[in-house]
Amino acid sequence: LIPYAAFCTLRDEFGTADFSRWGDYARYDKKAVEAYCRRNSREIAFHCFVQYHLHTQLSEVCAYARSRGVVLKGDLPIGVSRTSADAWIHPRLFHMDSQAGAPPDAFSASGQNWGFPTYDWEHMAQDGYAWWQARMAKMAEYFDAFRIDHILGFFRIWEIPVHAVHGLLGYFNPALPYSADELRGMGFDTAGGRFTVPAPDDRMLGELFGELADEVRTTCMKEGRLLPAYATQRKVAERFPGDDPRRSRLREGLMTLLDDVLFIEDPRRKGFFHPRIAAQSTYMYRTLDPQRRDTFDRLHDDFFYPVSYTHLTLP
């Protein structure tokens, strides 16, 4: 309760829940927070007071419902916000360099990006999943049943690098990515960023940007590659905010350009690569010769839609 009250007080003091902007308090330190609480005891007490009344009111509602034969079901979303008290207090339990989402489907061509960090299950296992046990125990005080939103995410999640906006740049975790040697043996040498970094030609720039193509070529690129200031979708989104038609054209075009890769390097296993899902729609795929396209199709489909065991049935 006290760390949560400290989080609320710091959030109000700095005017943002983004704790990376809290200066000396950006990283949770128990002793520093305890000292802060002593200096701000009035504000800390207020947030504790609010939580106490929330607890008593919800407990009364639950008791009344049960006395009338009604049970309450609580909703348990798979993730928590990256600017939450949990992420601030327990950063080691989360992959803060990643975000959860969903691959593209008929309803979302670029996939979904939910924004919250994925769980670091290895660190959670070290204390017997104490964070989860405490979370479930607290919910059990009020609810008789839980609905777990996205139960599959406990076993396999669509993980997107934090610098990306589109779900297209994600990959499944856990997964078995291809090694650089495996890809090289199949005709895809990823050295120097080949197949993993966008390499647009004039035709692609013309299709994406129209009359703005020359501006993109001279302002955003050097030697056929995007400059560092435009090298991620997050940077592009920050660089071109708003709904102005020109800015929107540049932003969306650069976003699409950054999606234009065949493989994504695993951030925690250097030298291992995931095929970019649905990469057959990319300009880069179009530049492949027929034989290499066929090879990519097979390695892509075997990775995402393996059929080797589909003939097996459960006993």
Report each predicted region and the residues it spans.
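Catalytic cores of glycan-processing enzymes that make or break glycosidic bonds
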Residues: 1-312
